[in-house]
Amino acid sequence: MGLCKCPKKKVTNLFCFKHRVNVCEHCLVSNHNKCIVQSYLQWLQDSDYNPNCSLCIQPLDSQDTVRLVCYDLFHWSCLNELASHQPLNTAPDGYQCPTCQGPVFPPRNLASPVADMLREQLSSVNWARAGLGLPLIEDPEEEETTTHSGTSFSEWSTFETTSVDVSMSNPTLTSLPPHQDGEHIYNNREQSAPNNTVFNMVTTSATDTVTISTVTSPRKLYDTRDLGHSAVMQIDFDDDKYRRRPALNWFAQVLKNCTSTKKKTLALKHRIFLLLLFGVIGFFTLIIIMAKFGRASAETDPNLDPLLNPNIRIGNM
């Protein structure tokens, strides 16, 4: 359990693996919507995380994300594509989290910022609106596509001249349609090769194709601060709160504060008071110990026994 640093100051067991801070659900939705967030106990077990989407093996920061009620994070386009391949008569319980097999739809009686954000995202697609009990929305009409079989060579020449005129006035940036590379995204779940994004840029001179490839790999984050400098400045870093400390660290801190030269008059009076207090306690402790041992030796001393003294006669009068 930890305390979130937001103005609400809520106690939470959620821990952001990227920023290494405790976060509540309000901060999770507003400031950590693309961060890996799980329980703090899981962070103590692993102390590592994978910043990539488990469906397409691409960084989570590259696209819009969706967080389920189990706090697993995916690309919204990947989860939508995966759920769209399910049969139309699939029950709401049939849509499960790809990681933990938990439910995709939040329970109806669950009221939390994460559940509200998830319902808002799911309400934008038909397969999820059916599971949420909402009416379906009409699909937008698909754009008309041209085919090579129904045109002649004269029509193609006319089309090429008109496309050049349009490109001179409004240059366009097009990409491959999502239905062509939808299967390629989910085939990469067992491969480590990155996806290639292809942009077709139409200009007046020629058609240039630019291929952008990004490769990322999860890496551990190490602390590169200067330990000597941070120990002198005594700055409260977030990582220091979760670092293991020796058992007598508090005693060393007290000695360091007592031996510090940058103390004011109030600190000097406090030190004198502590010395006097310890001296009085030690003095009374010594007196009690000496009195106890002295009384015990007097009780066993034969010289102090009146029955063993020849000068003292005790008898019947």
UniProtKB/Swiss-Prot annotation:
Gene Ontology MF, one = zinc ion binding
Q: Name one GO biological process term.
A: vesicle-mediated transport
Cite the residue ranges of zinc fingers (B box-type).
1-43
- Give compartment(s): Golgi apparatus, cis-Golgi network membrane
Q: Which InterPro entries does this chain map to?
A: ZFPL1, Znf_RING, Znf_RING/FYVE/PHD
Major subcellular location class: Golgi
The molecule here is called Zinc finger protein-like 1
List residues in topological domain: Lumenal: 293-317
Annotated TM spans = 272-292
Domain of life (superkingdom) = Eukaryota
**What is the documented function of this protein?**
Required for cis-Golgi integrity and efficient ER to Golgi transport.
Zinc-finger ranges (RING-type)? 53-101
Q: Which GO terms describe its cellular component?
A: Golgi apparatus; membrane
The alphabetical list of record keywords is:
ER-Golgi transport, Golgi apparatus, Membrane, Metal-binding, Transmembrane, Transmembrane helix, Transport, Zinc, Zinc-finger
CDD domains, alphabetized = mRING-H2-C3DHC3_ZFPL1
Q: Per the record, what ranges lie on the membrane's Cytoplasmic side?
A: 1-271
Task: Give the family from UniProt.
Answer: Belongs to the ZFPL1 family.
Bilayer disposition of the protein = Single-pass membrane protein
Q: Which gene encodes it?
A: zfpl1
